[in-house]
Amino acid sequence: MKIQTFIFNWRGQYQNTLNKEKQFKEIGIVPTVINSDESYPFEGDNWHCIGEESYFNAQFLKAIELFDGDILFHVQGDASYDNWKDLITDAKTYYEMANWGIYAPNVDYTWYDSSRTDVNTIDFPLDKLKMVANTDCTCWFIHKDVINWYKERKLDFSKYKMGWSWDIVLPALCYINQRPVLRDYNHTISHPRGTAYDTNKAEQEMWHLYNSLPSDLKEAFGLIKSNKEGLSRYYE
């Protein structure tokens, strides 16, 4: 099973990204860095500089373009953790056990905390793993099947900048196809509070994308946003 690791770097996160790159290399992984900080345009063949104007959406589209593995593992530049090896091992182990579509660790600061995302109407038998509506996109593993479903739908994210909807649309595809969306509370990623971008614009883009979706994705999208327990209908 090939896990392809991506780190997204942007202005102000250079040292954090280098630290993670070093951690990954110490366990035999050379991550691909999708970089939008033109102050550091090239740090090695594994760095892809896509321009200062690029935000999360362009970075994620670039990661999908470069992805040729079984699992896409994405980590934000401002996230930190001290045990990537065990997290990756658990991702593999639980894939073999549960055939998940998306697997992610807990994050210490995210809008999608347990109260907003745990789907309590779907029982999951493994300790500290929960079915969730949205894992958050700070650090997550996405199986290639989910990427392929996105491509087959011919969804057009290219017109957007912020990329808020990736962590809604991809879980929606998982629920429609009955592939678990899991958060592992055995691992917690450190993530700082606050954002450095226009959240109003991000929300406007999200709803613009929503209005362009086919009806089945709209339904799952709406449940993820406002009625997480309703997602259990996909498992009835």
Q: Language-model segments: what does each one mean?
A:
Residues K2-I7, P31-V33:
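Hydrophobic targeting segments
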Residues N9-E26:
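Short, well-formed alpha-helical segments that are part of the catalytic scaffolds
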Residues Q13, F157-E236:
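C-terminal catalytic/acceptor-binding lobe
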Residues E21-C49:
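Acidic donor-binding segment of Leloir-type glycosyltransferases
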Residues G51-Q59, G163-W164:
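A short, glycine-/small-residue-rich helix N-cap motif at loop->alpha-helix starts
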Residues L61-I71:
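Active-site nucleotide-sugar/metal-binding loop of Leloir-type enzymes
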Residues D70-S80:
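Short beta-strand-to-loop acidic/aromatic patch adjacent to the donor-nucleotide binding site
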Residues D82-S158:
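Conserved catalytic core of nucleotide-sugar-dependent glycosyltransferases
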